[in-house]
Amino acid sequence: SLGYEMAYSNVLNMLDLAGLPLRSADRPELTPLIVAGGTCAYNPEPLAPFVDLFVVGEGEEVTLEYIQLYRQAREECWSKEEFLQEAAQIPGIYVPAFYEPVYREDGTLEEMRIREGSGAPEKVRKRVVENMDGAYFPVKTIIPSTEIVHDRVMLELFRGCIRGCRFCQAGYVYRPVRSRSPELLAQYGKAACEDSGYQEMTLSSLSSTDYPCLLELCDDLLDYCAPRDIGLSLPS
């Protein structure tokens, strides 16, 4: 998951520590498959030589689609090339091996040429989860054996942001704004605390105080959290 550009070198370090060839072209087998997503996947070319496919946009739905395709590829003994050709047909999937960037003398991009015979689409459109209430939420999570930074239940109130700050990458790529209902969020938060044993719950979004039902949700969650000594917080 590529959250910011300074993490690119970490990706290469991870591949090196795993004993894997860095470049996708030097990994001819279907397994392992290197997949990248996150906000930086909207500008995939810096890591294009090293990643097999990028997920452009939101991953809840498209991840299930390419995993199902990957299972089929394993069962039917597809080659890596065959799998990537089929994966490229899934909306939101960008396979860099099927495209060749052409640059001008000043280093700016002139065009993207599609590799002949690849069947890759001319444009890759980002995936957007239309209905946040219907999107998957990880009520049951894997609890780490060591202390981690975000050692709490994270409730995503809504996706996107109404502010449009010019410096904020996430505020633009996660448009349009889509909210979860307060009833469902309260249900998720309580269930996640019961399952994990976490003693803190965070109401997380790009601008959480813009959530229209914030007071209603906080009242509901405080009635649950206070008797159980569970903290309820907003991100900074």
Where are these regions (language model features)?
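Structured alpha-helical segments in the cores of large, soluble enzyme domains
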Residues: I34-G37, A41-P44, T63, V153-C161, ...
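Canonical Radical SAM [4Fe-4S] cluster-binding loop centered on the CxxxCxxC motif
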Residues: E147-E183
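Flexible loop/turn segments at secondary-structure boundaries
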Residues: E5-Y8, A41-P44, V62-L64, P101-Y103, ...
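N-terminal [4Fe-4S]-dependent radical SAM core
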Residues: P96, G107-M154
